[in-house]
C-alpha cells in the first residue's frame, strides 16, 4: 500500500510506523494533543537489570526493536541491550526488496536517539507532542535503501501547540536535523477556525523561513491524511495508488484501457490485507474502505487533456 495514517495514541504505533516505512509506505501521523494524551505515563526500565535483545535482520525485526524499546519505557522491566550481530553488513545485496543493505548503523543511531528522548523523562511524566514527533522522525532516519532515505511523513499537530509551530524555526536543521523527515501541518477544523487564528499560524509560517508549518483543513480532527495530503483517511487506514503514463496516449480508447488496467492492479492489491504485524484495526478499516486512486504522469507531453477524463474515471470505478 502506498500510504497510511495513524494517530499516535497507542505505544504500539511507533513500531507500526517503522514497519510501514520499511515496507515503502508513506505515513501520515497525528501528534495532536488529544492523541498523545492517550499514551501511557513513563515508567523507566531498571538500569541495574539489563537484558540482551538480539535484533532479527528483517522488517519485522527492526520494527520489533523499536516496539520493545518503547515498551520498556512505558511499562518498566529490564533495560534492553541491543545486539546487532545478525544484521547484514553495509552493502550486502538485498534479495527480496532489491538494492543494498544499509548495515546496522542507521538502526543503531535510531535506537540511541529514541532512547535519548525517553531517558530524559521522569517516571510518571508523559511524552509531549514534539517529543513524539521527534521519535517518529528518528525512526524515519533509519529507513534507508542503497544509502538513500526513503521515508515519507506528514505530522499533524494541534493548531495551538506552540512547540510544534516553532519546530522548524531558527537553526533547527543543526539542532534537530531529524525534523527534515516530516512535513509539519497544523490541524484546523473548518467550522471552528477564526480568521485571527488562521493568521496567527500564517505569521509563524512567514517567520520560519521554511514554509512551515502547513495548514491542514479538516471537518474531523480524528481523521488524517497521507503525506501528500491527497485523501482523507480514518485512523489506521491505507490508501492504494496506481499511476499511468499518458505521455504517448493519443486516443480515448488508449486512455480508458490504461485506466482500466491500473484500476484492476490497484483493486487486486487492495485484497492483500493480511498485514500480520499490524493490529487487527488496520485490516478491518482496509477491508471496509478499500481506497484506490489512479493518477496520471506525463500530462504536459501529450494531448491527454483534450480527451474525456471523466470517461476514463468512470472506467476506473467500473473496474474497481
Language model regions located:
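Extended catalytic cores of very large enzyme megasubunits
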Residues: 1-320
Amino acid at each position: 500500500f502506498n500510504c497510511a495514517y495513524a494517530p499516535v495514541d497507542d505505544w504500539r504505533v511507533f513500531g507500526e510506523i517503522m514497519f510501514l516505512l520499511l515496507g515503502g509506505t508513506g505515513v501520515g501521523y497525528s501528534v495532536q494533543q488529544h492523541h498523545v494524551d492517550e499514551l501511557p505515563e513513563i515508567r523507566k526500565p531498571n538500569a541495574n537489570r539489563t537484558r540482551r535483545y538480539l535484533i532479527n535482520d528483517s522488517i519485522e525485526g527492526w520494527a520489533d526493536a523499536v516496539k520493545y524499546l518503547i515498551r520498556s519505557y512505558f511499562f518498566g522491566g529490564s533495560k534492553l541491550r541491543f545486539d546487532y550481530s545478525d544484521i547484514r553488513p553495509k552493502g550486502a545485496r538485498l534479495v527480496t526488496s532489491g538494492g543494498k543493505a544499509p548495515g546496522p548503523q542507521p538502526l543503531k543511531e535510531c535506537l540511541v536517539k529514541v532512547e535519548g528522548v525517553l531517558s530524559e523523562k521522569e517516571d510518571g511524566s508523559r511524552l509531549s507532542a514534539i517529543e513524539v514527533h521527534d521519535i517518529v522522525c528518528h525512526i524515519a532516519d533509519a529507513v534507508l535503501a542503497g544509502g538513500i532515505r526513503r521515508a515519507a511523513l506528514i505530522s499533524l499537530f494541534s493548531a495551538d501547540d506552540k512547540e510544534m509551530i516553532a519546530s522548524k524555526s531558527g537553526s533547527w536543521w543543526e539542532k534537530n536535523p531529524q525534523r527534515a523527515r516530516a512535513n509539519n501541518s497544523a490541524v484546523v477544523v473548518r467550522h471552528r477556525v477564526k480568521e485571527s487564528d488562521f493568521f496567527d499560524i500564517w505569521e509563524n509560517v512567514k517567520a520560519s523561513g521554511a514554509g512551515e508549518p502547513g495548514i491542514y483543513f479538516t471537518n474531523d480532527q480524528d481523521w488524517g491524511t497521507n503525506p501528500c495530503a491527497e485523501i482523507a483517511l480514518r485512523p489506521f487506514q491505507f490508501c492504494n495508488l496506481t499511476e499511468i503514463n499518458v505521455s504517448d496516449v493519443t486516443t480515448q480508447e488508449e486512455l480508458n484501457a490504461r485506466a482500466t488496467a491500473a484500476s484492476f492492479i490497484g483493486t487486486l492489491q487492495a485484497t492483500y490485507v493480511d498485514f500480520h504485524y499490524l493490529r487487527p484495526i488496520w485490516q478491518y478499516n482496509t477491508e471496509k474502505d478499500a481506497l484506490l486512486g489512479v493518477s496520471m504522469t506525463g500530462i504536459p507531453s501529450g494531448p491527454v487533456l483534450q480527451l474525456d477524463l471523466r470517461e476514463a474515471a468512470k472506467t476506473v470505478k467500473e473496474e474497481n
